[in-house]
A protein has these predicted regions:
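Short, well-ordered secondary-structure micro-motifs
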Residues: 44, 135, 189, 224, ...
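A conserved pocket-lining segment of Rossmann-fold NAD(P)-dependent short-chain dehydrogenase/reductase
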Residues: 92, 145-149, 176-190, 200-224, ...
Length: 319
């Protein structure tokens, strides 16, 4: 990336977004953050505010607000990293209108602001775990060419947002890269929510509370560490134009395997509590990172064992 780039990060007080903001500031860029703090926290930016406050500007705003267009236009970012979203699959099922307002209308507001500002690139956080639907096991790990058949309104909004990015590129010349993220985990992930099993397990293991595994625990996910994901966002600043790019490890890890590894690392010798399978949960998921290697020069380097150990250490230090 060029020195002293002007960047804007939506959702920059959230889990992934705040880690991205830290990386951008560490590389001496000027960063605007847009976040309504509905799920993000200013605590995630405490270190950045203390060390680099002169290059960080925070705006508490909901991306559904039409004024976002003017705000983005005024800030004139060279690159927009669009991570703000309603990201809870269950909420998208129970509140589909709200989900669409945030993830579709909000995205259009951000894109309109970028158009007026003359932004050269938008890097978008898509969802590899939802846009492909229930993949054929023979197709795992999924490539970007896999048919897209979302099974939730959330997955649909991510697919629609990609089409808006494509259209804005064709009509207005705004370059984009959409990163289809696998199951991201790492420091600052919320241990109290419904999503983010690594953070949930970490919080419960360290507080000596039982961890719950739903179904038989053999459902698999592709767990990718947040620092690796941030590196993909940074690389996409100048690469991968016009593409959907998977950001995952290509490795399936079952929930049982995940729990066993984390329990060992935490020094806990007790089985997880078992609960009935949750309806609508994917049986298996993994993303092929081959396109990311070719077009972004990106590869994941953090193993699940190393990454989950770092998460446990972070939770201990944050207690």
């Amino acid at each position: 990336m060029r020195d002293q780039m002007k960047a804007l990060v939506t959702g920059g007080a959230g889990f992934i977004g705040s880690n991205l903001v830290d990386r951008l500031l560490a590389e001496d860029h000027e960063v605007d953050v847009l976040d309504d703090l509905s799920s993000g926290s200013l605590a995630n930016q405490a270190e950045a505010r203390a060390d680099r406050a002169n290059r960080l500007t925070f705006h508490q705003v909901d991306i559904r607000d039409p004024h976002v267009v003017d705000l983005v236009a005024r800030r004139q970012p060279e690159v927009v990293y669009h991570l703000a979203a309603q990201a809870d699959v269950r909420v998208s099922v129970t509140r589909p209108v709200f989900d669409a307002e945030v993830n579709v209308i909000g995205t259009v507001n951000v894109l309109e602001g970028a158009r007026v500002a003359g932004t050269r690139k938008v890097v978008f956080a898509s969802s590899g775990g939802t846009i492909y639907g229930e993949p054929d096991p023979a197709a795992l790990p999924c490539k970007e060419s896999h048919p897209q058949a979302p099974l939730s309104p959330y997955g649909v909004t991510k697919r629609v947002a990609f089409d808006y990015l494509r259209v804005y590129r064709e009509l207005h010349g705004i370059e984009f890269t959409a990163l289809a993220l696998a199951n991201v985990y790492g420091p600052r992930q919320d241990p109290h929510g419904e999503a983010g099993v690594v953070a949930i397990f970490a919080g419960r293991l360290l507080s000596v509370e039982p961890c719950t595994v739903f179904g038989d625990g053999e459902q698999t996910r592709d767990y990718v560490y947040v620092d690796d994901v941030v590196d993909a966002f940074v690389r996409a600043t100048s690469k991968g134009g016009g593409l959907l790019v998977n950001v995952g490890t290509g490795i399936e890890t079952s929930v049982n395997q995940l729990y066993s590894a984390m329990a060992r690392s935490a020094g806990v010798d007790r089985p997880a509590a078992m609960a009935p399978e949750r309806p609508g949960e994917l049986a298996r998921s993994a993303l092929d990172p081959g396109r990311a290697a070719i077009h972004l020069g990106w590869r994941p380097w953090t193993t699940v064992e190393d990454g989950t150990s770092r998460v446990l250490d972070w939770f201990k230090q944050s207690a």
